[in-house]
Amino acid sequence: MAEDLSAATSYTEDDFYCPVCQEVLKTPVRTTACQHVFCRKCFLTAMRESGAHCPLCRGNVTRRERACPERALDLENIMRKFSGSCRCCAKQIKFYRMRHHYKSCKKYQDEYGVSSIIPNFQISQDSVGNSNRSETSTSDNTETYQENTSSSGHPTFKCPLCQESNFTRQRLLDHCNSNHLFQIVPVTCPICVSLPWGDPSQITRNFVSHLNQRHQFDYGEFVNLQLDEETQYQTAVEESFQVNI
């Protein structure tokens, strides 16, 4: 399939995955200067939290782009025509239907155990394996995320595979890849649980694989954990009215 895709287009399967959420693109948008592509929601969230720079290469992003990024319509059309393999069950799925497939793919849910989208405080149609979260639970998780922090300001976690503690996200990732790469034991992800949308009852079958797929970046760099999604959305809309078109 990948060979057919490359032969017919200039794209590879990697081009259909967002560098922020590490999932198949949803409503892809493209930066003008560096031509990098992101999910629209991921891009707007990154702009809100990180300023006027591309989330991938730190290239310049215009003020207009920050509010109204350009849709990557060419990529959307390609995603409707070509299929790729589900990363868990290997079933061939049209790229634009991949996220929908994840919602019913048992192997995907057993492997990753959490929502197939970038952080979402209110469960949406793209969520996988999460139950509805109450306001109280969200608040408690946010406080936990803030309290368990290192001197550098980054949250710290305990490894669920050996109980060694005080790891930042990156150190936990490195530790597990070095010491537990082939250890497949059902556990709860401490990073997911600490986040406002985390579900403490959600079990991840392959924790190290989950870390490598889900936690390659610190969510706090892209999302304001003090604000719910609706507040962030409204703020982005208000700011868009101030942009000179």
Curated annotation (Swiss-Prot):
C2HC RNF-type zinc finger span: 86-105
Residue intervals of the UIM domain: 225-243
Residues engaged in binding Zn(2+): C86, C89, H101, C105
Chief site of localization: nucleus
Region (Disordered): 125-154
Zn finger spans (RING-type): 18-58
Places the protein is found: Chromosome
Keywords: Acetylation, Chromosome, DNA damage, DNA repair, DNA-binding, Metal-binding, Phosphoprotein, Repeat, Transferase, Ubl conjugation, Ubl conjugation pathway, Wnt signaling pathway, Zinc, Zinc-finger
ZnF start-end (C2H2-type): 157-180, 187-215
N-acetylalanine found at: A2
Catalytic activity: S-ubiquitinyl-[E2 ubiquitin-conjugating enzyme]-L-cysteine + [acceptor protein]-L-lysine = [E2 ubiquitin-conjugating enzyme]-L-cysteine + N(6)-ubiquitinyl-[acceptor protein]-L-lysine
Subunit annotation: Interacts with NLK. Interacts with XRCC5/Ku80. Interacts with RBBP8/CtIP.
Function of the molecule: E3 ubiquitin-protein ligase involved in DNA damage response by promoting DNA resection and homologous recombination. Recruited to sites of double-strand breaks following DNA damage and specifically promotes double-strand break repair via homologous recombination. Two different, non-exclusive, mechanisms have been proposed.
Protein name per Swiss-Prot or TrEMBL: E3 ubiquitin-protein ligase RNF138
